[in-house]
From Swiss-Prot:
Gene: ydiU
Family note: Belongs to the SELO family.
Catalytic activity: L-seryl-[protein] + ATP = 3-O-(5'-adenylyl)-L-seryl-[protein] + diphosphate; L-threonyl-[protein] + ATP = 3-O-(5'-adenylyl)-L-threonyl-[protein] + diphosphate; L-tyrosyl-[protein] + ATP = O-(5'-adenylyl)-L-tyrosyl-[protein] + diphosphate; L-histidyl-[protein] + UTP = N(tele)-(5'-uridylyl)-L-histidyl-[protein] + diphosphate
Superkingdom, natural source: Bacteria
Coiled-coil residues: none
Function description: Nucleotidyltransferase involved in the post-translational modification of proteins. It can catalyze the addition of adenosine monophosphate (AMP) or uridine monophosphate (UMP) to a protein, resulting in modifications known as AMPylation and UMPylation.
GO molecular function: AMPylase activity; ATP binding; magnesium ion binding
Catalytic residues as annotated in Swiss-Prot or TrEMBL: 250
Binding residue positions for ATP: 88, 90-91, 111, 123-124, 174, 181, 260
Cofactor(s) for this UniProt protein: Mg(2+); Mn(2+)
Pfam families listed in its UniProt record: SelO
Upper classification of the organism: Bacteria, Pseudomonadati, Pseudomonadota, Gammaproteobacteria, Vibrionales
Name this protein carries in UniProt: Protein nucleotidyltransferase YdiU
Binding site for Mg(2+): 251, 260
Amino acid sequence: MSIWQRVSFTHRFSQLPSAFYTLVEPQPLDNTRWVAWNGEFAQQFGLPAAQNDELLAVFSGQSEFEPFRPLAMKYAGHQFGVYNPDLGDGRGLLLAEIEHQNGTWFDIHLKGAGLTPYSRMGDGRAVLRSTIREYLCSEAMAGLGIPTTRALGMVVSDTPVYREKTEFGAMLIRMAETHVRFGHFEHLFYTNQLAEQKLLADKVIEWHFADCASAEKPYAAMFGEIVQKTADMIAYWQAYGFAHGVMNTDNMSILGQTFDYGPFGFLDDYEPGYICNHSDYQGRYAFEQQPRIALWNLSALAHALSPLVEREDLEQALSQFEGRLSQQFSRLMRSKLGLKTKIAEDGRLFESMFELLNQNHTDYTRFFRALSNLDKQPAQEVIDLFIDREAAQAWLDLYLARCELEVDEIGEPISAEQRSEQMRQTNPKYILRNYLAQLAIDKAEEGDFSEVHRLAEILRHPYDSQPEFEAYAKLPPEWGKKMEISCSS
C-alpha cells in the first residue's frame, strides 16, 4: 500500500497570480539523513509514524513529487522598526498544503531548501544548530498549549554551510495553518498593488476567517480577528515567560501563531528586561516590551490595510488590543495560581508577586511549579526560592488567604488537592531552557541525535512529572543562565 494513500494535498497559494511568489525547485543537500521525524504529529495527516527513505526523498526535495509545487513567497516587513522592501522566502519553500484529521489544511514549508530570488546576500541554507532549536521550540510551545507553528521533521547533510564557523546544512519541515504574514500585506501596499492586496484579503477571509465573509465590513472584521488572535498569543508568551527575540512584522502570523523561532529564550530568573537576541542592542524586543511591539506591529498592518478598511474601523480594532491582552493574561495568571473566581484585588496580588520574583531573581518556572505542589510539599519549598524569605512568607500568606475564598460551581470550598492538581496542568515542570537546547545541539553536531529525541519527548509533556527526567527541571548552570542567542542561522 502506498504511504500516500490516506493523505490529501492541495496548494491554494500557488493558484494566486505570480506577483505573490516565484516558483523555485529545492536544491538538495549532500547525503541527507533524518535527524527527527515527528511520528505522532505525522499520523494526524495520514502519514506513517515511522520515518523512511521515501519520506526523506520527498520532504528533503531530493525527488520530484507531483502534489508539490514549490514556491518562494514575496513579502516585506518592518525590521527593528525600519521598513525593508527586499524580503521574501530567502531559504524556504512552500511545497503544498496537507489536510489534518480535523479538516484543517496545513502548509508544508521546507526551510533551508536553497537559493531563491529573495535570498539577498544569503546562501539559502539553514544550519543544524538553528534547525534543532526551531524543531524543539515549536514542539515545546505546542506541548505548553501556546499557539505555534509545528515541525514535521528535520534532516541533516554533509553539505558545508559557512557561518561564524563551518557547520552542516540542515532542513526543517515546518507546518503551519498559514504562512501569510503581516509583511505580505505591507509589500502589496507599499508597491501600490492594491488589486492584489484586495485579492489576498479575500483569500485570507475565505481560507481562515470564514465568519468575516458575512460581516457588514469583511475586511474590518478580518483585521479585528487578527488583533484578537495576536493579543491572545502575546498573553501566552508573557504568562509562560517566552521571549521571541525578533518580532519584526515579517515574523508575525495573521493567525496569531508563534512564528519563526530564531534567538528566542524562556525566562530563567524572572527578569522583565530580559533580552534574548544578541543583536538587539537597544532592547526593542526585550521580554517586557513584547506587548507594546505587538501593538506597534498591528498598527503597521493597519496602515497597510488602509485602502481596504476605514480609519475609524482600524482604530476601533486596535483599541481592543490592550483590553483583550489584559483579559487573557489575567485569565492565564489566575489559572497558574489556581484561582477560578475573579475579584478586584487579584491585580494587586499579581503585581506584588511579580515585584517579589524580580527583586529576588527567582526562577519563574520553578516558582509556579513549587506553588502547584503545596498539597504534597511544605510551604518552605516555595519560601526557599527567595532571598528575602520574610517577604516571600508575607506574600504566600496573602495568596493562601485568597485561596480560601475559592468555591466551586455549587458553592463548596475547593480543596488544596483539587487546586494543586489543576495548577500542575497549567504550570510546566519542563521548559526549553537555552542551555538544554545547546547540550542537545553539541551532541547532534557529533552525530548523536539521542538528546534531541529525548528532549523533544520530554517537552511534548511538560506538565507531567516524568520523575526519570528530573535533571531536566533543575536550575540552569551559571554558564547557561540568560543566554543571548545569535541570529546567524
